[in-house]
Amino acid sequence: MGLQTVNVIDNEKMKQLYQRSVVFFSDMILALFPAQWFSLDYFHLSTTMQEIVISVTILTAWLSSFVAGYLTNKFGRKLVILIASFVFTIGGLMMAFAHTEYVLLAGRAIIGFAIGLASMAIPVYIAEAAPVHIRGKLVSTNVCFITFGQFVASIVAGLFSNDHINGWRWMLGLSAVPSILQLIFFTFLPESPRWLVQKGRYDLAYQALTKFRYANTVEEDIRTEFASIKESCLNSERDRNNSKSIKAIVSNPMVMRALFVGCLLMIIQQVAGINTVMYYSATIIQMSGVTDKSTAVWLSALTASINFIFSFVGLVLVERLGRRRLTLSSLFGVIISLLILAAGFQLAEINSPPVSFNPNPNDDSICSRMRNCDQCVSSLICGYCFSENTKSGNKDLFVSLLQTNKFNGTCLPKNPATQLPFANSSFCVNGTRHSMMWTESWCPSQYSWMTLAGLMLYLFFFAPGMGPMPWTINSEIYPLWTRSFCYSMSTSFNWFFNLLVSLTFLTLTNLLTIYGAFYLYTFFALIGLILFYFFLPETKDKSLEEIEFLFEQPLCQLHKKRQNLSRFHNVDSTVNVSNENVNPSITTSSTNDS
């Protein structure tokens, strides 16, 4: 694609822009992701407390996303990002030095507040500072750094997986490093030009826009772009003056269509199961039959690396295929991979290892009546004990029998007196018999490869499309006068459904089985594919001022291409700029407005 002169940008400056503005998300996931395994083990939390500690971050992120729109509109995108970085640092350090579960809980709640602010402010900041031809790529880079954070977090978890005492402290403490870096470096970036224009600070806005454009760009081209931005802001201000309430926003069909599409994108992203896959990847891998916990952690790092690598494929495709085609093709692949993932778990359940031995023939407990491993681990009070070593010859008769076949096993009651993963009696009663394996949540399976293949394919298809596109499209489709509010609303939907899916995953696996849960996610993804085929417009190669007029059409016609959308093609930039007393002598060498 040829570059328009007005869209030419200093690659080094924009590189600094997105590196500094998205490093936060590496931090975000580093604190959210696998350290929870080890920190929860350290504090020996009850099941209820575990759910609270895991979910409180998402809950506070959801709540803070409601106020993020007001704060970014009132105080600016830059200041909110700086505040989020500072708060994130405090939360990370609190978790690292936590000596009670309540301090850990408070630290995760504080981090959630920062995440909610940043997840709204950062994409909007990038979209408002970037030129048209690479806006989608830069906003998508934001999501790429989320996947980078997941990858780094998985590597860190693997490195510290053998340290069950203090390893989790290092994982959580390291999360403060990227937020400190962002707090320092982001200080030197200017505020969003569009926000400055909206506040009437035209000189500072022109300086900021100049700093985001290539040093040799013809000044007239920058002035033309600035005039387009200014006229859009003036129109938005008039709309704002006539639309002081949420009722006015709701009564605006164009805004409501855009908000519907934006929120739907966020909802489908979550109900397609992405954060279930990422939060519980190591657990899913264990549930597929991988027995060693350390191996499961490293395999989860492999899945995170696939997510990270292929998210960068989206950077290439977003400006070539466009947002619409990339989203639809990504969802189609997600549906196929979810079917494979669900089928793998279903085959594993159908062929679940039998309960071959009962060490206490007179025992008539619930556990003794279980017929296979799947029934056993589905119970809240039982676990499955089997041999990892297939060699016989052990002096213990039952152990010898178990060792003749990896898929022989016995169902035993859990030990209610301890949080340690041992049975209450008989085999697996303690950790001294290293040949015996004890599981309360998964079963050994010969179909592990199928589940892992589905998991890898899921990330292969999700990462380039449904990962970044909801954030990219939401940063583009709202008019300036309501952008902060609408983006805040769509972000709130994202975090709410993130929380809902994460909280219900284990419940769904109990009610529907794990493969039933993934079939349900497949159904949601299919519904999303159908809806987006009709409701999702293409925003590629359109300015933010042009995009809002896409939604003049009814929802069912949004997928159709339209031409000549812009009301700004014939803007007399010289008149518009000079009327607002913008100093024409301002050049790219102007000092930075922090």
Regions found by a protein language model. Give the residues of each.
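Short intracellular "coupling" helices and adjacent cytoplasmic loop segments at the cytosolic face
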Residues: 212-224
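Alpha-helical transmembrane bundle of multi-pass membrane proteins
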Residues: 1-212, 234-594
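TPR/TPR-like alpha-solenoid helical repeat scaffolds
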Residues: 222-233
